[in-house]
Amino acid sequence: MARPGSHFPTELELEILKILWASAPRTVSEIREALALAGRDLAHTTVITTLGTMAGKGQIEKLEPEVGKAFRFVPRVAHAEVSRHMLGDLVHRVFAGSAEAAVQGLFEVKDLDATEIARLRQLLNRKTKEARE
């Protein structure tokens, strides 16, 4: 059952969503193997329980088996939607709603190469133009 008030995926749920966003549908065994390759060697029952919780939250959908008895899972939420909500929450809670402070904080913890800086400059130029219109 989903925890009340739990709008964002937990760390493990986010890892599973990333696996499903990369390639879906996936079975429990396939998800467990992908988690193990990423350094999370979990019991089969732990993965099943987590998938049930995620289905209850509406993050994933359990599909009926095609062949055999293995259920398959697909994401019900898009990566862009999850990242937008999580970033918005972070900006609100940590940076008091200031996007500028969040970007400054990002620059302090992440080194950017020239290509990333150029792309960010293009984005800022576009946003500046939109704000003036």
Region spans (language model):
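Short alpha-helical segments that sit at the start of domains
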Residues: M1-I19, A78, V82
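Short, cationic-aromatic polyanion-contact patches
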Residues: T10, P65-H85
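Short capping segments at the starts of secondary-structure elements
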Residues: I19-T27
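Short acidic, hydrophobic short linear motifs in intrinsically disordered regions
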Residues: R26-L35
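Alpha-helical DNA-recognition elements
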Residues: T53
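Glycine-centered, phosphate/nucleic-acid-interacting loop/turn motifs that mediate DNA/RNA or nucleotide
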Residues: G58
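Short beta-strand "wing" residues that participate in macromolecule-binding interfaces
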Residues: K62
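Amphipathic alpha-helical dimerization/coiled-coil segments
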Residues: V82-E130
